Amino acid sequence: MASLIREWVGINTFASATQTKLLELLGKLKQENVNTLTILVMGKGGVGKSSTVNSIIGERAVSVNPFQSEAPTPFMVSRSRAGFTLNIIDTPGLIEGGYINDRALEIIKRFLLNKTIDVLLYVDRLDAYRVDNLDRQVVKAITDSFGKGIWNRAVVVLTHAQLSPPDGLPYEDFCFKRSGALLKVVRLGAGLKRRNKQDFALPVVLVENSGRCNKNENDEKVLPNGTAWIPDLVKTITEVVSNGSKSIFVDKKLIEGPNPNERGKLLIPLIFALQYFFVVKPIERAIGDDIERESRPSWDN
């Protein structure tokens, strides 16, 4: 389900300092001839995807209810400001019953048909203290659906960042360890080889969507480390847009994969070669040996 493009009035709800930073960042994109930005938000259920969408927009554009399951279909929020259009696509969680929800993934892919993904926000919780194989499966499912290139356009977003780390750990140390563990899983799930790691600088941004988020003297929402997180997130998104990698256009081929008939045609020469060397040649040798034996004089046997 998609919404009509509306005037981005939610930006007026931000603190003046935040508004100024956001308009400067969007102005830089327009200078680079980027007039439309489409952000895809993905991850497990209950991690704060919809709340993050609402925080960026500055209004309750997507329904959020902690006591109800997520919407089963994607939803695109579109807002326009001074000739710039921002599209954010909220999606259902990719896990159901401890496994990848293939049906949800298929619905997401069909929804994205003929759309261009400029940035992927991969959302998880900062206060999830461990990663496991399920995280790897989610990353692999995204990679299998949209290709490895999607991670060149990605930002890892860790929600619930207004926390006190366990065991008296310094906040920065805890965030570094948590994000490092998740980034390792992303590399494994995306199938990025060791030689790619230097080129794979996946940015991580911390966010706090709840009303209890602290504020600084400029009335901006800030994290325990003092970062004004809304402009920090938007700044990181604009940096990804400008990093030189290509946006992901979701066409039918990307969704359905290679044509099996075309794939079969590519295998025909290989099959013929194998048949020749392992079937035809041995038969020819055997026939030649038989002819040679039959042509010998009986006394030579």
Regions found by a protein language model. Give the residues of each.
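Conserved GTPase G-domain substructure that encodes guanine base recognition and part of the catalytic core
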Residues: 1-301
